[in-house]
């Protein structure tokens, strides 16, 4: 699954276009490397997202095309 879609489905970022812009601006990295929105997310990846002065680091636990709002938080584990 593409990184921008994963960020939207898991509700880490509200809209896919914003996720795409964040990737283009270099504010998203996977496994320590800056990545594009087309990066293929795999289970076990470490994704780091910078929101202004705050940084969120998560481990990908599941990759699903669709999920409910209640189950979205089960797709990742917050590390920092």
In which residue ranges do the predicted regions lie?
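A basic, amphipathic helix-loop patch mediating RNA/tRNA/ribosome contacts
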Residues: 1-41
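C-terminal structural segments of small proteins and small subunits
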Residues: 53-80
